[in-house]
Amino acid sequence: MLSVEKCPPPENSLLEKHLMNGNYVDCYTTTIDKPVSFPEFVFGFYTTWLFKTERLILKALVNKPSTDLQAKQLSNAEIDHFAAWTVEARSEGEILLCDFVGRTRSWLMVEQAGAATKLYFGSAVVPAKGSVSLDFGFRAMLGFHQIYSILLLY
C-alpha cells in the first residue's frame, strides 16, 4: 500500500531556501517500487485527475489555462510557464515554481533509491509584502491544503 509521509525538505533542495521566519513550508514524500524519471513524475503529477481539476479551476477563476501537452513540455524543460506558475528554479531532479501572484511556491523532486524512487512534493507560502506573518485566509485553508497535498502524491 502506498503511504505518504510529511518530512522536512531535503538539505540543499530548492524548497529549503524558503525555510525562514514567517513562511509556511511543507514537504511530503512517498516511495514507488520502480524507477521513475523526473520528467515522468512531473508529467504524471500535473496530469492526474485531481490536478486536472485544479487546472480547470485556475482556467475558470483566473484565466490561467493549461494542457497536458504543456505539462509534458514543462516536464522536459521545454517551457517555463505552466497554468498559474512560472519556473523559479530547476536542477537535476527537481523544480520549484512560483505562482503568478508571487506568494506560493510548488516544488517537486525525485530521488532514486536503488530499484525504487522517492517522490517529493512541497509548498511554500510567503507573507504579503509588508507583512511578517501569513494572513487569516491562508491559515483558515491550511487543513485543506495539507490533505490536498497528501492526495496529490497518491
Can you name each region flagged by the protein language model?
Residues 76-115:
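Hydrophobic-ligand binding "helix-grip"
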Residues 102-143:
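Beta-strand/loop substructures that line and gate deep hydrophobic ligand-binding cavities in soluble
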Residues 68-78:
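Short aromatic-glycine motifs in intrinsically disordered, low-complexity regions
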